[in-house]
Each structure stands twice: as C-alpha cells, then as structure tokens.
A protein has these predicted regions:
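Short, hydrophobic/glycine-enriched beta-strand segments
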Residues: 1-9
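Acidic/glycine-enriched connector segments
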Residues: 9-141
Length: 141
C-alpha cells in the first residue's frame, strides 16, 4: 500500500513523534511492502523522510518493491532530502524522487492520486491549511 504523509511546516518534532511516529511504526510492522510518499518541505515532510529513511533503509533489500520512499518536489531538485544525503546515494537505497511540479497544489494532488491512505494531523483546527486540503481531496470534500 502507498501512504501519503502530510502535515504542517510549523509542527514541532515533539508533536511529530506524538502523532505520526506511532502510525508510521504500525505500518512498518504490519505492511510487508509499505511505500511512503512525502513532500520536500520543512516540518512534517522533513521529519517524515528522515524517520522513514532511518527506519527502512537497512531493510529495503528484503522488501518486494525496489523502493519504499518517494519524495515529491517542485522544479528540478528537492529542497530537503533524508538526512541531507545526495539524491544519487539515496536512489541506491530505495528512495525515489518525483519532481517538476509547478505548485504545491499540483504536487500534493499528485501525491493523493498515487497513494491509498493519508497519514495527516491538522494542527490547531486549521481546516484551511494544505494538510487539511489533502485530507479533503482524498475524501472528495
């Protein structure tokens, strides 16, 4: 299954650990072939890519899929990469990149389209945020 991780740029790492880490770990334990899709922004995107990469980079050779993490970015290159590593090194370890999007909305809609499930937390009831729009898009709201 493919999981779209989205969240606020200003979420604290403590809140990421509280709301996202348990869900991601449950998926890693229960899905033998998880594929996570994330954006390349700071905040939840960066926390998620680092956590997922650190958790799965040693296991990807045992998984059915040759990749487990896809980072979607605008333009030619991502703003952030897992643990700040170069794209070439990451691609050898199960991380793919999908770029060239012209807007956040185009990129996020593509992530919704290629995934089956959202991992998202709306902070402070901010239902006009990009994170909330991702959830609404999934459910046709």
């Amino acid at each position: 299954m493919k999981y779209f991780v989205s969240g606020h740029r200003d979420l604290s790492y403590d809140d990421f650990r509280k709301y996202y880490v348990p869900v991601i770990l449950d998926i890693i334990r229960s899905d033998r072939n998880p594929i996570f899709v994330v954006g390349d922004c700071k905040g939840v995107d960066k926390y998620a890519m680092d956590f997922i990469y650190t958790s799965l980079s040693q296991m990807h050779g045992y998984m059915e899929s040759p990749y487990y993490l896809v980072i979607f970015h605008m333009f030619d290159s991502p703003r952030n990469t897992p643990n700040g590593l170069p794209e070439e090194e990451l691609e050898k370890k199960g991380v793919l990149f999908a770029g060239g999007f012209k807007s956040d909305e185009e990129r996020d809609a593509s992530m919704t389209n290629v995934s089956n499930y959202d991992i998202a937390f709306v902070k402070d009831n901010r239902w006009d945020s990009g994170t909330a729009q991702n959830i609404k898009r999934r459910h046709g709201i």
